[in-house]
């Protein structure tokens, strides 16, 4: 760090220069001697020694004072030497301080670095003469101080501090205003001059300077001694090589620098302190190269502790760089480097400072307090460290050593032998720090050699290049023994006796050089590798056995035996094998694939860039012309021939290069014709000449395919070649492209995109069928592709910009290739280059990759410039017509561009038309042939489904998985689709093998080699037990097997199994790439191959792989998508197969697998029919319900085993008999005679008789019998029949022959669902498991809930009864039931009754969920018209009552339905209503079309109708059923409400909900309740409710609770605000009530209440209670009016009447009633004037006839009273319209009042109050203020009128105040709606998702599992409603059964 002294760095330099000039030792005198200590006396000098100073960055050699000088003017020679030393010098300078002060070093690092840079700059720029003090003063305009120093001054001013104190006052006196910085600079310059002029330099300073000068000249430094400049060392004649006494490995190895530094600091008994001069220039004196060498050897500190270090002797690049970086550390011959600051801590100045041993501080002696006369001896800590208590801790080997007669040589060499790591007498290398024992060298040395000795590392020859990889190693012969040349000097007594001189063998490594081909591989010594590729060498050591050379690795895969035979026959092969092949180099790697490019060197010689076979492009290498490689000349000729062909004559082979080429001219490629020579529309009867020349022969159907493709090309029709897998689509495509080329139609280029795994196969086929094509495979990593782009795309060097980044190709550049083969991924990744080329033809293999037009592949490929497109696919219809449409859209977007139109066109016509029309569309575009048509003699294939039992271990895990996931499975817990999928995957794993779970895998017995123990592996899985028996028999019979599994981990287990069984096998999965994959296939298909099994993963093994040598396929676990399985077994059943193929599909009985297989079969049925998008897609569209059904399959039986304890002990397993059935049924059991007696659940007939399946030898033999009938999948055949019309390319499409037998085509079948299935099955197991877990976790035993198992068994029985009708489809109670019409307590009898009603229909199965009949979609048997009629009925009457089927609710269109079908449809309809999702979607989740259903409107209507119905029921028992007394039959009141309700047999009437048995249907009130209740109050606008997920829910109580909460946050003020808005709008706007309709929708509560109470449902809590804070007159009026009304009725009609709607005065209804009744009573026209009575009968009419059926109501004699008020208007023309409008408006008002009543009822029951700080309350306070102000100043108006002027003035002020208050209130009112807090959605209030709420509400009312706390406790929702909301008591349950029934009735 520079001090304030500007030129501080220059200060000591001049001081040192003087000393140097006097005492410098010349290079000649020094003579390059290193035995420095021989030339100096041993006695110590009086003063502490001051060692020469190396720069502060050089490492510390010991504690000593130091000064430094440097020569200002170096000779050129010296500068050269300096440069040389800098490049060769080492950075190895051991330091003591480094370790001790690591922390401080880090802090100082940045400072030092900056300082180093400054110094380097200084050095680089040459040495500048510092300015003198006079110059500085003159420059700054200061007065100089001319003071002559006397001798005394020179004696007294011995340090800078004293000098400064003396001179500073003098300068300040002359220059009073001198800045401090300039003062310090001048003082520095003065001190420098003073020191330079000091005549007394011969004393201590002189001694120190001499030492500095001498030491800087030498490199090996002795302990510091004062010498006189006169002493000149004499050169020695010859010297022995350097030796030293090392330390053994037992000695603690310290940092080498620390050890050496102590020796160097020990010139005296007392170690001198370290001194340093701040800021001394790091320029060093010149030194000879020899002197630098020991310094050089210090290179690598780490090398001391490691056996292998980079060569310190070679001037390698890395070392130069390193030296340059650390140049400052080695500049001075021998200083030391410390981390100390270079200025005094006290005065911040440089100079001679002493360094603290325990911290980085430094001090002047005079700056210490107290001052020190001289440096203290030994270790010294500064005042700061002493204060902090930090002490220097001595190290073990810091003890002072006794000094001998001569000084110890200072040494940087290793303390131990590099080979054996032991101490003793060591031979030291003169060029590096290595040390060796003589006997450890190879060969050993007999004695210490004379002169300079370099170690093996320094004499090791450099490598010829960079090593890319190590291929092999071997032992070499020992080196020849070392011959002793000169007699050695005396051996030191410590040397061990010499060993025998034989050398030891060394390792040699066979290496591949980077940038060179395998032809250049060679052997290198171990030491070379160790020195130049340390990391690679170490890694190789770590991974390989370094005692025994690796066995020979024949990379070609040949066995030793084969190799020997070939060597005997082929001497060239023998030579190559010995030199290359045995070391793992494949012969292909040394064969030229093709020459890519050429270049000329300066001499004009040509070099070729060669691509080697089977190696990627990034391993291309440049080779010279003359290298001897087989076929090299031919390939050169081919290269030049291709250039000539593409570029013309100019590009032919240069004449000077023509050598052997002349002989090869005849092989030149034939140029394609420029014009077409053959008409492509003419058919070939036999294959063309250019195919004959390849030696191949096309099958007749392939020739037909070629003709069809050429014809389509001529017509410009893009095509799909859809031949079945295995018919050679690849060959037909290649021959087609080749024909275009050879016949002159097109020269390319052609783009072929294929899956990566098949690209190698494409290459081979191109080589075979199109030899003249130049085919480039564009795959690989970035480097490889970069090489391809630069060399294979064009002949021009600059056609494409080089580098890894992809650029476009220049326009109109000659393309080099004919065909580019690439993968799907690179089409998108390297779009820039590929998209810039104009392609003559595009071929996409496995084109179903284009089935989604949203995929990137589709979009990118669509943007390419392509003349003609050809798609290849074996499965053109994988899932649905939508995918086929996308293929056609890709082919011809101008023709196929309207997806909706396409699908619609094929959705509404019958199948025959559809097929015909599709054929007309597809005919020109698609050709499809089947193996069955093409190869009449091709062996058949038989597919058998083999049902397998779970092993005991699998059963344990299967149960565990279900139990552990009970909460996710139990729909009440709200399990989602993802979690169900996860559970299903776990169960599939369990069916495969329990070891797929980490827990089981860890516990499994293992073999020493890490694989599983075979016997336990087999016993753990039922499938493996069967596989073991099957494989044994198959092997004996000579069959070969393919085993497919989806899971690669399962393939790992199968590998262990096959190893255990001793079978040889191959394996392919997603991780095995193209090359390795093809090799494995080739090995398996090779004649006489030993491999018996081939393991494949279903998806990776499904593409373009030919394994026709196998004849047995075992599908270990089925894929979700059946097409993947078909592709899998088509690997074996293809061209070349000459045996019958047996396919065994393993399916675990009664498990998810069995169900999945059935679902997969159903998907296959969709393949040839489905045209609805989305219905047939893959697992993505699995609904939660489908997943749930799959998971349930077989579980009951599994857990029944637990309960029954496997009761079937008396039955012994018998031999299974394979029943080979068609797989159409989905469950073909190659099964067994089965034990009978089990009755598994579900409707799967296959399983019903089955129990444990046991396979014995007889069963296995039967299973493997190949004479069984072929059972090709019928669905598959159907699909193929559908596509069969494309099998003959006659250019006109044949019509479909088949006729559809079945009238109804099943699209989708609804699954049966029991809501409580998991609850009953798993609850007990789950609780037990939780208890065990809690006990294990130390939570104590759970208190068991008392369960009455009798009840449970009854419930179970009931459940079974319910399911007895095939689990009737409408029992989807969990999500679809509605409680509006269900009354749980009395439900049992109702249930039995309904069961009796159902009996007749029980045997008749329900129609399928979705079917197509005559082109029209049916849903559960309801056609479009019936569905519309059902919806209209819902919109008219609300929810169907529970006994709707017996009432006349059923309209004419629905009367043909059975009750079972009707109920199922109601259930489905409600489920759809409650399904969340956008109304805009085309279908519901299960695929049923929405048909424009607006969920919000329907739910709103259901809600409104429910409120109306309940209000009428409330008063029905009083008012009867007739509006006028003369119509009433006798004693109508005597009838029960239920009877009263449906009176007119001709009119459909909803039955009273109170009567209904609990069935899974209804949802009316529930929905109403949920429907829009929450947000509507504040705004007059209707909003669709998010909380409407109401699914028909079976638990009345639950729903009530939830709903309550749901409504709970009402308040008076909100209501008041409603009044303000609504009262104004109620009559005027017909829409407004609609808005309110939604409110009722949310009020299920009342309904539910009806359900729970079988009596009249008067659930209206006292209105006044609700209005505590703001009592309204209306309420009292209401009661009074009712009383009056009652009296009048008695008088007038003796007819009792009661009706009220307690709207709390929030609507105008009561005001109207009051006025109307007053008028009616006063005039006596009780019937003629419309009032309360009419309103009641209007509502009753709506309940009977439906919503807004005004005319029907008026025509009904029961409601005659409604016509009375209009009699006087009959004569008017618009009489009817007027009457209907009035009724509609009046109904809206009633509707509004009903909504508010329901809200108030809930608010009252929940004791809700409004926060006094709420804006609404503030408005109330303002109103009171206005009233108060007005009343208190009433008298003013009289006085003012009386002429009182002061009163008049006051009156004006008061009026102003009132005006202000009123305007404020007006402003507040307008803001009020937005300020009133809206009720949050029910989901937010309950803190649950909509799904969770719905599933929670699915519990049945009597269900003991209802957990009330979840809904009852107010904590759940208290905080949602603000601070002042009070719930129904402290955590109590909202139970509406406890509420008062109906206080709003008059006449009691």
Curated annotation (Swiss-Prot):
Location of the motif DEAH box: 845-848
Comp. bias intervals (Pro residues): 1547-1561
Chain intervals for the UniProt region annotation (Histone-binding): 341-651
Catalytic reactions of this protein: ATP + H2O = ADP + phosphate + H(+)
Keyword set, alphabetical order: ATP-binding, Chromatin regulator, Chromosome, Differentiation, DNA-binding, Hydrolase, Metal-binding, Methylation, Neurogenesis, Nucleotide-binding, Nucleus, Phosphoprotein, Repeat, Spermatogenesis, Transcription, Transcription regulation, Tumor suppressor, Zinc, Zinc-finger
InterPro entries, per the entry: CHD_C2, CHD_II_SANT-like, CHD_N, Chromo-like_dom_sf, Chromo/chromo_shadow_dom, Chromo_domain, DEXHc_CHD5, DNA/RNA_helicase_DEAH_CS
Start-end of PHD-type zinc fingers: 341-388, 414-461
Cellular localisation: Nucleus; Chromosome
Gene Ontology BP annotations: cerebral cortex neuron differentiation; chromatin remodeling; negative regulation of cell population proliferation; negative regulation of transcription by RNA polymerase II; positive regulation of signal transduction by p53 class mediator; regulation of cell differentiation; regulation of transcription by RNA polymerase II; sperm DNA condensation
Pfam assignment, any one: PHD
Domain of life: Eukaryota
Modified residues (N5-methylglutamine): 1388
Biased composition range(s): Acidic residues: 17-37, 71-89, 289-299, 1353-1364, 1374-1383
An example molecular function term from Gene Ontology annotations: ATP binding
Sites where the protein binds ATP: 723-730
Domain notes from UniProt: The PHD domains mediate specific binding to histone H3 unmethylated at 'Lys-4' and may preferentially recruit the protein to transcriptionally inactive genes.
Family according to the record: Belongs to the SNF2/RAD54 helicase family.
Protein name per Swiss-Prot or TrEMBL: Chromodomain-helicase-DNA-binding protein 5
The organism of origin for this protein: Rattus norvegicus
Gene: Chd5
